[in-house]
Structures are given as C-alpha cells and as structure tokens.
C-alpha cells in the first residue's frame, strides 16, 4: 500500500512538473523602434460601393490585434473600420478549425469539414466571392505571402475535400476565372507527377505568367496576370519588406480599370506560422 501511494505521489509530482514546464517559457517583448504613422480615414459619402477588398490575417485573433496595437503605441490603421464583428469559422466535424474549413467559410459562406477547400460537407464545389464577382462582371484577384497551393488562396479559387492534395488544388487555377494572382509556390505548377504544366495552361487561357518581380511590376497590359516569382513562400518579413502591399496595389491598379469594379482577397499568410512557432517578433512584423 505504501509503495502504491509513493508511486501515485511520484506520478502527481511529474504531472505538476510537466504542467508547469509548459508555462515556463521565456517572456517575449516587441516594440517598434519607430512606430508607423496612422491617419484618420473618412469614408466617401454619396457613392455606391463597387470595389470590395477582403484582408485576412491568417490565424489572427483579437489578441494578435491587441498585441500589434500595443507594439505600435496604441495606434492601428484597423481602427479606421466603421464596424467590428466576429466571424465564427468552426469546422462542421471538428471544434478547432483550420485554414481549409475556416477559409471556405469566409470565401463562400458555407461551413464545411476540417481540411476541406471550397467544397461543402459532401465534397461538392461551392461558389466563392471570386465567382460572385465574376457573375457581376467585376474583376477578381488574390495576393498572398504563402504558396498558392496553401489553403486560404485555394479556398477562393479551388475545390477539394483535402487541402493536402496540393497538386490537385493548383490544377484548379486555370478554370477558376480569377484575374489577378500573386503568391509563391511555383514548384507545383510544372514538373508535376501528372505531367501537366499549369503555367502553359494559364498562358493558353490568356494569362500573362510572371516569374520575376521585375516582370510583374513592369506589366501593364491588363488584369489577367498570374505572378509566381517564388518556388515556395515569399521571403521572410525583414527581407520582403512591403512586398505584399506593393503587390496588392499593383492588382488594385490593374483591376480598377474595370468600370464595374473588382473583388480582391489579400492575405498576410505567414502570421499563422509565427503564431505556431510562438515567435512574437516575426508575428508583429
């Protein structure tokens, strides 16, 4: 009996040590040496909205927003928003969602299974905001800092029951109807197991395929451009700087020529990665 009690006490001690070790992490701090300026924006009055820009911070929660607000001395461009709400994006078959299921909820308004991309719970494709824009005669585009086979961009342009079927997802882009695309992931567009060359298929559809930043920023013909200058993700924040902002502005410039307007999804894709890695400094950059 004494031995059993000793074993139980030892086991409890190990549990306590293990639990405390999980929270025995070094404190991280981050502050912008030079806070960026934030201006007050006034919405134009008396004009009908024709352009829609959806900006997604991958994996971003209210805590991320508050942390950024603190790091920038209590100022964020986000505070110019005239309304605040919460989007509940749980998966239909799992409490904790992922960018496949959660992003599909944002892109289509339809809840779906964990890891599903652009499909309902039965695996049937559902129309996204890209499709809605095209039906209205608008242009549609996406700009991301991740691989274009990653879940969020695919939620708007592709359809599959499993986000891990990366080559299959990339194979959906030529038929997606999206006009402007910027992101990484070139390695799965050519030299594929199925023998398809997605870049050539895009060219056959009338896209200008851009494989370098110089070519991308110099292009000025129309909005049908598929820019994939990187084999995988775009570079880390310190290296890429304001690349996402500049790429997004390029898309806006090209698609704004459509008199009926445009829809654009812009994703800060790498926030999620640094959240997983618990890297506060990279998360804030």
Model-derived regions: residue spans:
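Bacterial N-terminal signal peptides that target proteins for export
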Residues: 1-8
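Hydrophobic helical h-region of N-terminal Sec-dependent signal peptides
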Residues: 8-16
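Sec/Tat signal peptide C-region and signal peptidase I cleavage site
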Residues: 17-21
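N-terminal catalytic scaffold of extracellular/periplasmic and nuclease hydrolases
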Residues: 22-192, 198-216
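Gly-rich Lys/Arg/Thr-decorated short loops/hinges at beta-loop-alpha junctions or inter-strand turns
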Residues: 106-114, 226-237, 272-278
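Active-site His/acidic residue clusters
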Residues: 151-157, 231-234, 251, 256-285
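Acidic-aromatic/histidine active-site loop/patch
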Residues: 185-200, 221-224, 230-237
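A Trp-anchored, charged/polar loop motif used as the substrate-binding/catalytic surface
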Residues: 208-212, 241-256
């Amino acid at each position: 009996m004494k031995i059993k009690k000793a074993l139980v006490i030892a086991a409890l001690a190990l549990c306590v040590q293990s639990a405390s070790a999980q929270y025995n992490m070094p404190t991280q701090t981050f502050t912008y040496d030079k806070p960026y300026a934030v201006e007050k924006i006034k919405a134009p009055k008396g004009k009908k909205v024709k352009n829609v820009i959806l900006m997604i911070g991958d994996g971003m929660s209210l805590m991320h927003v508050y942390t950024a607000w603190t790091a920038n001395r209590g100022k964020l461009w986000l505070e110019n928003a005239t309304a605040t709400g919460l989007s509940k994006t749980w998966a239909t078959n799992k409490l904790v969602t992922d960018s496949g299921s959660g992003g599909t909820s944002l892109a289509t308004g339809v809840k779906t299974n964990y890891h599903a991309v652009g499909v309902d719970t039965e695996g049937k494709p559902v129309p996204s905001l890209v499709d809605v824009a095209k039906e209205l005669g608008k242009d549609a585009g996406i700009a991301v800092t991740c691989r274009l086979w990653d879940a969020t961009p695919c939620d708007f342009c592709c359809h599959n029951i499993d986000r891990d079927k990366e080559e299959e997802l990339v194979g959906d882009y030529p038929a997606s109807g999206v006009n402007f695309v910027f992101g990484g992931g070139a390695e799965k567009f050519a030299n594929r197991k199925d023998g398809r060359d997605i870049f050539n298929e895009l060219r056959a559809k009338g896209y200008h395929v851009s494989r370098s930043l110089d070519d991308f920023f110099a292009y000025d013909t129309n909005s049908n451009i598929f820019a994939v200058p990187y084999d995988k993700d775009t570079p880390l924040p310190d290296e890429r700087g304001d690349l996402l902002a500049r790429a997004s502005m390029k898309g806006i410039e090209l698609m704004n020529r459509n008199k009926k307007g445009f829809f654009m999804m812009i994703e800060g894709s790498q926030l999620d990665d640094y959240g997983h890695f618990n890297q506060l400094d990279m998360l804030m950059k």
